[in-house]
Amino acid sequence: MFRNTIRKLTLKPGVTISTGFLIFITIGTVLLMLPVATADGKGTSFIDAVFTSTSAICVTGLIVQDTPVYFSRFGHMVILILIQLGGLGIMTSYAFFSIAIGKRLLISQQVAIKGALDTGYAEIKKTVLVIMLSTFIIEAIGAVVLAIHWSGEHFGDDIFYPIFHSISAFCNAGFSLFNDSLINYSGDVVVNITFALLIILGGLGFIVLSNLYGVFAFFLSRNSKRKLNLHTKIVLTMTGILIILGAILFYVFEHENTLDLLSFKDKVFVSFFQSVTTRTAGFSTVDVGSLTSPTYLYFILFMFIGGSSGSTAGGIKTVTFFVILAVVYKMFRGKEDIEVFERTINRRTVQKAISITIISILTITLFCMLLLYTENVPFKFIIFEVFSAFGTVGLSSGLTPELTTIGKILISILIFIGRIGPLVLALILGREIAERKIRFPEERIVVG
């Protein structure tokens, strides 16, 4: 009976994905605790190693130790590998190495990969190879651009800097080898555009990138049959709207605060960059601790939304947020069907979107209460850190390094939950919804 239970659990995609993340968190923790991983040769404490490993593999970027100073080159390499594996996705990375050595994937692994990448079983191998190839090409281009641009810097001969930051940006990780993130490059056009493009591409998701590649390839072959699917259209629409809206809000709220001493050009670049990075990546070109309260509030909303499904980003995802808005809009219009771009979104998708949102809100509320109990700091900073952790963003008001041991553990758990997703967590803890042959009579209830 016990074996049967274990066997059923391992067949669940959520369990497979979560187990993979936990294994790599453990490996990363052990490696970061080694004396060779730190600059002083003493190794990282267990709690700090767990936190850093979790933050890296879950591509978050929240830190409890100053990454560029505290860790050695070996420690930086460990963090970078964790970021790359976490950005690609544990199952995608495992599938790639299995394909490379000719090993067959287990059924549970195929189910997990199929769910994560929205692909058919027959196309798993092709999809994984395309993802790996496109990832390395994009990251390589980003690294080359940064290496050329940074050639005059004091670290100009060190190719590790551009490689580290290119991977961190594309994987939306937010880890940096600079003490003040990208504040010193707030007016640098090349750095702003390169990082922004890497972050946007990583935040769109492999499903969208694959669809865009397919459309582009068919366009070049003069075959117009391949079109953008509904998912891609929604993602591109929401991404564009959120970037523009975020840039405008940041400029309005900060033009007399953190942007006050900058030129108009630099104000525009900083506003654009912060809008891009706030939902997903966690890099910053301003002092986050000095932001106005309205900016904190809109940052919190953007971190909650996050990036797109199948991407390196966290949050409830742009498509989920779009579906929620569409449901509300259609209810006000007195319509039952959710119709978008001449397509109807099915009820199961709507139920998933609502479930993800509610579970996310409940999770965030719980962790806010726990941290308010364990940490003696204002609510404003607690809620900002909680949303940043859940959305795997990595922006911090400066609270994270000052957390108590219990606080660090709570944030680590929240980062993990935010990365694997509320829906996956619900699948692990509960039973899958099955179709019932017998249904009870329907009856109206009063809500609102």
What are the language-model segments listed below?
Residues 1-448:
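Membrane-proximal intracellular helices of multi-pass ion channels
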